[in-house]
Amino acid sequence: MGLWIDATAGVAGDMLLGALIDAGAELEKIQQVVEAVIPGDVLLRTEEVVRQGQRGIKLHVDAQHEHHHHRHLSTIKELLVNADIPEQTKQDALGVFELIAIAEGKVHGIEPEKIHFHEVGAWDSIADIVGVCEAIRQLNPGLIAASPIALGFGRIKAAHGDIPVPVPAVAELVKGWPTQTGALMESTEPVGELATPTGVALIRHFATQDGPFPGGIINEVGIGAGTKDTEGRPNIVRAILFNTSRSNPDTRTLVQLEANVDDQDPRLWPGVIEILFAAGAVDAWLTPILMKKGRPAHRVSALVDSSEVEAVKTALFAATTTFGIRSWEVEREGLDRRFEQVEVDGHTINIKIGSRDDQVISAQSEFEDIRSAAVALGISEREVVARIPQGTTE
């Protein structure tokens, strides 16, 4: 199953969460997860509203005991790490806050860990981020794509005074992602802020593909509504769940980068692969080769989304001794993916399941989970694998 997020009218965390709930995520379970992170402080509720003739779900986040909005990244990390919530939700939420902190750090010229959040540090924004992460865990899409993001234009009042739209943090977060102003047709009037840092960070964390609706069999259409009822355009975010298995397999057009290197210290290669992944590579690998005059060498390769090509090229030049990089477009078809969780002596193991035409083709345990369980239980990784319950894909 795939998820496509339509942000052509903008995006905010509460709107995206409303859309995901409308598409089938369970509000009660989301509330339980949010409660585990910030106990007794936030109540989530939904309301069906109409925005310019379009029905949608308005999510209300009622903060019961909000004292201040200025929370450091370390404080929010501590809340998440100590919360008894699904590990996938926890890691995704940590990743989103890290993205925002990096963007804010660039804007203010300080280290991400020293950032103190303003609006994003409020209970309602924390609830939005944790809620969306849990909703996506529940829906479990194998592919997440999103449209170009409408940013708006003009100026708004914020914690740091009168600032331009897109606000500085959003401008950092959307680097490499297609955007549009979101201006109404035949109008030059400023439309204000359409995309918030929270909304943009959620898309950048989850979406691996940009562009129009990828096509397929639509199963659900969730509509999340904003607070304003803007004249001339519904103030909504759409979350469309679709089946890709029969009419549109998970096929992506990627760019393959390659370089032959014969003078690199071999001890550096593991770090090179890590650097390529950190720069945005979808996959990266090393192949032993023989070059002219029988010299042993390595071919380093990476598969990259078009939006990340320059970043990965820069990383490859910096991390190796190569003087040139080859590149070409390739298509990669993948299985539809979903995750199931099993328990081994109280430790969660994620199982990645691949299917095609609704038939399970492959089921593989996540090795990092196996390793963590082995260390915690004081047994071998092989023993952990042997204890994984059979029939998880049935």
UniProtKB/Swiss-Prot annotation:
Q: Name one GO molecular function term.
A: nickel cation binding
Q: Which GO terms describe its biological process?
A: protein maturation
Xref: Pfam families: Ni_insertion (PF01969)
Q: Which UniProt keywords apply?
A: Lyase, Nickel
What is this enzyme's EC? Answer: 4.99.1.12
| Reaction catalyzed | Ni(II)-pyridinium-3,5-bisthiocarboxylate mononucleotide = pyridinium-3,5-bisthiocarboxylate mononucleotide + Ni(2+)
Alphabetized Gene3D superfamilies for the sequence: mk0293 like domain (3.10.20.300), Transcriptional regulatory protein pf0864 domain like (3.30.70.1380)
Task: Please report which protein family the annotation says this sequence is part of.
Answer: Belongs to the LarC family.
Q: What does the record give as the function of this protein?
A: Involved in the biosynthesis of a nickel-pincer cofactor ((SCS)Ni(II) pincer complex). Binds Ni(2+), and functions in nickel delivery to pyridinium-3,5-bisthiocarboxylic acid mononucleotide (P2TMN), to form the mature cofactor. Is thus probably required for the activation of nickel-pincer cofactor-dependent enzymes.
- What is this protein's name? Pyridinium-3,5-bisthiocarboxylic acid mononucleotide nickel insertion protein
Please name the source species: Corynebacterium glutamicum (strain ATCC 13032 / DSM 20300 / JCM 1318 / BCRC 11384 / CCUG 27702 / LMG 3730 / NBRC 12168 / NCIMB 10025 / NRRL B-2784 / 534)
